[in-house]
């Protein structure tokens, strides 16, 4: 199936990493096991400070779903367990031990039953990689997915391409073979053919995948690479029983690597990008998942007037350089953006030839230039205002949902109306562009994230005793 997306926005941001044939490998001293993506669930810690652990050791367990573990990608010593508001778990920082000895396993995928495979996925931390729709929560073992979507079309700003992510392997062919094994494991686990969505620029070994998966191609501006877009156009979610699990390319590689090589894949390609970073520091590197920023960037040489972001500029997590920033669980980018401390004098009188605008507030909105690169900073350029009921948001929203009515419905917690408007299909990332172009400065990502969590709790799906209501 071929899908052409027309609504969205191609963001040409300054500060892209330099393309290079050789990617340097950096071995970080500290690694974080990020627990923030599991904030919707109750977790039980399996480690304490100063514990000695091995790669693959359980770090946390789903409290309401015993047996599902989040595991460590490395061997080392637990340096710190960090908590946030109301003692919520943020992450576990591990000090790597020299000369990593990765724990090896021996699993023959062809000889495993689905029940045995499920136990392996839960025990080895592979099940914790899945995300579940509706609600955009970690996948629950009590739910059986209608479909599984694998995303090979991610086009978030600065994010390493699928081809670039294969650099952790000795060859492209080896990487796709590992991917093939991962797809086979997922297909056998759930007894279905996963949907694999890629772009025309990616040459997939389709001959090997056609028998085990549905292959789709998608084109168009950001966010054509969002899982929500893929689900919306291929197999829409119409009610709460339409359970869909999603995986990224990197996560399928992790699954395939365990069954093929017998050990955890703990490396990934990371983009160091952003206009707040010197051009000599913008590059791609290979490092351990969850690596601390200081191992990858000389923070002492970077201006204090920048924002450090784990992830892309639109949906990433703002980090405090004084609090040992580390890569998030699903992040493959460190974005460094200027953070001006002073307001621009008479900025409302300036033409804004190079300022980003979608509503033609500045002159740049009337100039059709092919190679204009935006240099955004973290300034809001105005204060928070009432939501403007306009169609500008819908022009950058590829899903066929009305943005403003949906936002108003979830703010007032009218979830019945919200579901009628498409609430079950969305995730916070889908509102990155509406937030970016919003004249009202409304934090739509946060609103949707909190609303999804609240509604999931209201349905009771996060409890082991939950049963589908006929």
UniProtKB/Swiss-Prot annotation:
Q: Name one Pfam family in it.
A: NQRA_N
Q: Top enzyme class of this protein?
A: translocase
Q: Which UniProt keywords apply?
A: Ion transport, NAD, Sodium, Sodium transport, Translocase, Transport, Ubiquinone
Q: Per the UniProt record, which EC number(s) apply here?
A: 7.2.1.1
The record's catalysed reaction(s) read: a ubiquinone + n Na(+)(in) + NADH + H(+) = a ubiquinol + n Na(+)(out) + NAD(+)
Q: Name one GO molecular function term.
A: oxidoreductase activity, acting on NAD(P)H, quinone or similar compound as acceptor
Q: GO terms for biological process?
A: sodium ion transport
PANTHER family per UniProt: NA(+)-TRANSLOCATING NADH-QUINONE REDUCTASE SUBUNIT A (PTHR37839:SF1)
> Would you identify the family this protein belongs to, as annotated?
Belongs to the NqrA family.
Known partners and oligomeric status? Composed of six subunits; NqrA, NqrB, NqrC, NqrD, NqrE and NqrF.
Q: What does this protein do?
A: NQR complex catalyzes the reduction of ubiquinone-1 to ubiquinol by two successive reactions, coupled with the transport of Na(+) ions from the cytoplasm to the periplasm. NqrA to NqrE are probably involved in the second step, the conversion of ubisemiquinone to ubiquinol.
Protein name from the UniProt record: Na(+)-translocating NADH-quinone reductase subunit A
Q: Which gene encodes it?
A: nqrA
